[in-house]
């Protein structure tokens, strides 16, 4: 299962105004956060499921990182906290030479992914 920052460029929105689009994700990921603040989620995911809730929390964390200016991305790069890291393909696998070394896109060793994975566990219920 992979999550990753997307490769699209658009405008900005706040995480509270997140647009969600279901589509067939061609790269095998379940979802991606877009630079305009929207989230693309794979059409195979039941949008009302606990899995979708977890995925959306993960992608909203990426949107928050983008909004705060801590993260940005383009087709061939990811910016994290002011430093640029390049995307590559190695043996058919998309990797990023990030601050913690070369890891596949979506890997928890990337600090932006570690934060997003932690956000999946946050309970937002107001009981």
Region locations from a protein language model:
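Short pre-active-site segment immediately N-terminal to the catalytic Zn-binding motif
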Residues: 37-56
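Acidic glycine-/aspartate-rich tracts in secreted/extracellular proteins
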Residues: 46, 69-70
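Active-site recognition of the HExxH zinc-binding catalytic motif
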Residues: 54-67
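Short, surface-exposed charged micro-motifs
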Residues: 30
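Metalloprotease/metallohydrolase-associated module, dominated by Zn2+-dependent proteases
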Residues: 7-27, 35, 73-127
